[in-house]
């Protein structure tokens, strides 16, 4: 059977439940029943902001990719194609919510106030994170596949124990978000997180960006059932959303977050999307997927979809689009200059953030390491 989005045979995505879509690839509004009310208050200006977010973060992504190819970054994990999934979710969250990302959540980082330059610094090796997770309510990037799901679940359990959910106070009730890709769902950590979340009724949203490939493995080689059903056996209800539709992502994420915030337990969203670029800059996607498949997804580009909608509804004129392009150019120049100006960190800094408080053993190791470095200077002086 052929998926209505992927354009390729993929039995893992066959389902008797339709995918939630609110904007067609042509930019036309699609009614979605239960989720329409969550989009009712959105204005043309809101849709223009969605467009701006996606254009700017795509430009950040392009610069990150280019900087790595030029030897300025050690690695980069491209986001292109997944902007709607991340921006839609990011703009649906509240300030107190806590996001636990993987290494590709540049759009969510943007929504949580993490500066693009800071992301570049991490991939440049200038620091190990560079932002305060508590300030941004956004954990540092997680490289170990699936481990962040346990962190998000544990955090949500703590939120419940502290009484910060189901109080009726929208500025207090808190959820956590466990981000992952389709490949991560094969990790045992994800199953453990789902089980603990369900058993302890933890306020956590499991957010799966199904971009069709776990590095080089297609969905058909990973799973025999659609991912939105993955939580069912654990007691975690799920929904599948057109991940290239920012309006659907926003509405479903807001509905799910409201339900979790009200104390109704964890939920799961599968954002059905496509990674247009490589898994990372260490990868060559032409080795495992066809150009025809990628071309079919270009027709569903998340940014073009919103642009068509804004045109169709007369919300934006050419001047608006030109101004966004100019802003993207300025952003690209800014972050490129910032990246090129970054100085290597002092070697001793790796000891500074091991523990919250100073620890005598760490301090001793730092002293020994500094003495070791000084010995080279002494030898050079001789």
Task: Give names to the regions the model predicted.
Residues 1-84, 277, 286, 291-382:
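Conserved acidic/glycine
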Residues 11-13, 89-92, 258-260:
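A general structural signal for short secondary-structure junctions and capping/turn motifs
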Residues 17-18, 37, 62, 70-71, ...:
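Residue-level signal for pocket-adjacent positions within structured domains
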Residues 27, 104, 243:
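Residues that form or immediately flank small-molecule/cofactor binding pockets and catalytic motifs
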Residues 103, 271-273, 354:
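A general secondary-structure junction signal
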């Amino acid at each position: 059977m052929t998926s209505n989005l992927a354009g390729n045979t993929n039995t893992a995505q066959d389902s008797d439940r339709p995918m939630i879509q609110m904007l067609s690839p042509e930019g036309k509004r699609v009614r979605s029943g239960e989720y329409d009310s969550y989009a009712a208050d959105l204005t043309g200006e809101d849709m223009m902001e969605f467009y701006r977010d996606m254009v700017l973060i795509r430009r950040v992504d392009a610069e990150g990719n280019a900087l790595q190819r030029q030897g300025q970054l050690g690695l980069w994990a491209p986001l292109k194609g997944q902007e709607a999934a991340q921006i839609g979710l990011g703009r649906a969250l509240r300030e107190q919510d806590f996001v636990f990302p993987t290494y590709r959540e540049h759009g969510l980082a943007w929504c949580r106030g993490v500066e693009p330059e800071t992301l570049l610094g991490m991939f440049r090796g200038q620091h190990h994170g560079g932002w305060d997770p508590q300030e941004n309510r956004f954990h540092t990037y997680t490289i170990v596949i699936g481990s962040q799901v346990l962190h998000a679940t544990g955090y949500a359990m703590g939120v419940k124990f502290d009484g910060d959910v189901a109080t009726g106070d929208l500025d207090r009730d808190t959820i956590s978000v466990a981000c992952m890709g389709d490949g991560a769902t094969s990790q045992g950590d994800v199953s453990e997180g789902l089980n603990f979340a369900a058993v302890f009724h933890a306020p956590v949203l499991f957010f799966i960006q199904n971009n069709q490939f776990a590095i080089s493995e297609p969905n058909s080689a990973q799973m025999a059932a659609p991912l939105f059903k993955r939580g069912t056996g654990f007691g975690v209800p799920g929904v599948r959303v057109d991940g290239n539709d920012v309006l659907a992502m926003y509405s479903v994420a807001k509905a799910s977050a409201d339900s979790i915030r009200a104390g109704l337990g964890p939920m799961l969203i599968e954002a059905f999307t496509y990674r247009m670029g490589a898994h990372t800059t260490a990868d060559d996607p032409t080795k495992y997927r066809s150009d025809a498949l990628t071309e079919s997804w270009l027709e569903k580009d998340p940014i073009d979809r919103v642009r068509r909608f804004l045109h169709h509804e007369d919300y934006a004129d050419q001047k608006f689009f030109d101004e966004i392009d100019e802003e993207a150019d300025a952003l690209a120049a800014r972050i490129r200059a910032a990246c090129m100006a970054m100085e290597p960190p002092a070697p001793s800094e790796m000891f500074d953030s091991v523990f919250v408080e100073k620890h005598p053993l760490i301090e001793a190791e730092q002293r020994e390491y500094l003495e070791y470095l000084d010995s080279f200077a002494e030898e050079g002086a001789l």
